[in-house]
């Protein structure tokens, strides 16, 4: 059997490549009918992800521990899966005021692959190793390998290399695959079933992966002190909208008025968490910085330490 025939045969056993019996007539429907089919399938995704909360929680714990030791969260994937990793990574600096080096998205084929497929990139095992070497992967880091099919050579190679370097590896897939599972410490496999359009894993599989990545990054940041109540207390006020959000967050966190919030932000160099602590406790910026540092950046703990 030649290589191509072998791959065709292999695809028969991949869940995401199956033909969905619920959408066999989709080409006969009007626009509303097509959308109803898509919506019905989409509604299955969140409940399936919900069954994986124990595994996702284990992943969060690994990431939190890594952050505490100076490690990074590194997503690696190809195609839609890789793009979703990049999307989650680039949102972390404005949302949580972390360095762009703390959460990294690696996409097979590089930055250009965000906009146009790079032929052969997902099949290139050495490329994944080179990409991880380029960011100086260390044993402190967490690598999340994302592949809907669970078979992408680029991703599996990256996961295997990461484990060889002593890094912990989390797998996020939508089809059970033994070689994939063997290369990760935590296997998060959301089997959402065959797609509305056969093999189009940008649909249910992509939605499931997005939900899981949202959980991994957001929960890890919350557990690292990046929220107060449910407020984005470390938002980076880097544009007019985010500055307005920062003002509003200070007002919500402290129940102060607009002028007080703006004054505190000015004194805190637009650091929302610092400004909030100053308003809540009456500390000046230097004292508030010290209080946050002694409480590892957790605003609630710093407030309680001051007896407020």
UniProtKB/Swiss-Prot annotation:
One of its GO terms (molecular function) is ether hydrolase activity. Disulfide bonds: none annotated. Keywords: Carbohydrate metabolism, Lyase. InterPro entries: Etherase_MurQ, Glucokinase_regulatory_CS, MURQ/GCKR, SIS_dom, SIS_dom_sf. The active site is at residues 91, 122. CDD domains: SIS_Etherase. Pathway: Amino-sugar metabolism; 1,6-anhydro-N-acetylmuramate degradation; Amino-sugar metabolism; N-acetylmuramate degradation; Cell wall biogenesis; peptidoglycan recycling. Transmembrane segments: none annotated. A lyase-type mechanism (elimination/hydration) is suggested for the cleavage of the lactyl ether bond of MurNAc 6-phosphate, with the formation of an alpha,beta-unsaturated aldehyde intermediate with (E)-stereochemistry, followed by the syn addition of water to give product. Homodimer. PANTHER family: GLUCOKINASE REGULATORY PROTEIN (PTHR10088:SF4). Specifically catalyzes the cleavage of the D-lactyl ether substituent of MurNAc 6-phosphate, producing GlcNAc 6-phosphate and D-lactate. Together with AnmK, is also required for the utilization of anhydro-N-acetylmuramic acid (anhMurNAc) either imported from the medium or derived from its own cell wall murein, and thus plays a role in cell wall recycling. This is N-acetylmuramic acid 6-phosphate etherase. It comes from Colwellia psychrerythraea (strain 34H / ATCC BAA-681) (Vibrio psychroerythus).
